[in-house]
Swiss-Prot record:
Lineage: Bacteria, Bacillati, Actinomycetota, Actinomycetes, Frankiales
HAMAP family, alphabetized: NaMN_adenylyltr
UniProt keyword annotations, A-Z: ATP-binding, NAD, Nucleotide-binding, Nucleotidyltransferase, Pyridine nucleotide biosynthesis, Transferase
Organism name: Frankia alni (strain DSM 45986 / CECT 9034 / ACN14a)
One of the Pfam families matching this protein, by short name: CTP_transf_like
Keyword Nucleotidyltransferase: yes
Assigned protein family: Belongs to the NadD family.
Enzyme Commission number(s): 2.7.7.18
Protein name per the record: Probable nicotinate-nucleotide adenylyltransferase
Biological role: Catalyzes the reversible adenylation of nicotinate mononucleotide (NaMN) to nicotinic acid adenine dinucleotide (NaAD).
InterPro entries in UniProt: Cyt_trans-like, NadD/NMNAT, Rossmann-like_a/b/a_fold
Enzyme class: transferase
Reaction it catalyzes: nicotinate beta-D-ribonucleotide + ATP + H(+) = deamido-NAD(+) + diphosphate
């Protein structure tokens, strides 16, 4: 599951759990982005903070792991590089790339997008009632859409809530709430 995870929240965890159950996955690997090329217009928290929050959020689920592949690579991060790395490390595994359906709708803007579908099956998750018109050019055998239980949670809302001093309990796992407070993350972003 790729994402900025700034911060990771319960919606991410529910989506990962739902996809794992539907596709009978042995493991879901969370891959916090290093320097996401598509988010250069906004401040993104330090990759180490995002990695540690994701680690804390997933630690209780034995099916979840967190990879540093994008963080350790350095520089702008692209999904194609991550999938090539994962394919090299796991040549016999069937890879699924879990992302938001809104991000999946933009996949033709991603670097080397044609090769992406050779490396992994893409799962776009959306909330109930969210209408998504996917490009007809997407290969049907390499892309699935999955509606997950609606959780009105977003990373941007969590950052804004912290910035204005509002509580974030139950929006993100307790360990992440404590980590954000300890590191004073998002407090200057109202």
């Amino acid at each position: 599951m790729g994402g900025t995870f700034d911060p990771v929240h319960n919606g991410h965890l529910v989506a990962a759990s739902e996809v794992a159950a539907l596709f009978d996955l042995d493991e879901v690997v969370f891959v916090p982005s290093g320097q996401p090329w598509q988010k250069v217009h906004r401040v993104v928290s330090d990759p180490e903070d995002r990695y540690l929050m994701t680690f804390l959020a997933t630690a209780e689920n034995p099916q979840f792991t967190v990879s540093r592949v994008e963080i350790d690579r350095g520089g702008a991060t692209y999904t194609i590089d991550t999938l090539r790395d994962l394919r090299g490390a796991r040549p016999d595994d069937e890879l699924f790339f879990i992302t938001g359906a809104d991000a999946l709708a933009q996949i033709f803007t991603w670097r080397d997008h044609r090769e992406l579908f050779e490396l992994a099956h893409f799962v776009g998750v959306s909330r109930p009632g969210y209408q998504l018109a996917l490009d007809a050019a997407l290969p049907a055998n390499s892309v699935s859409l999955l509606e997950v239980p609606a959780l009105a949670i977003s990373s941007s809302d969590i950052r804004q809530r912290v910035g204005r001093g509002a509580p974030i309990w139950y929006l993100t796992p307790d360990g992440v709430v404590r980590y954000i407070a300890k590191r004073h993350l998002y407090q200057s972003r109202a």
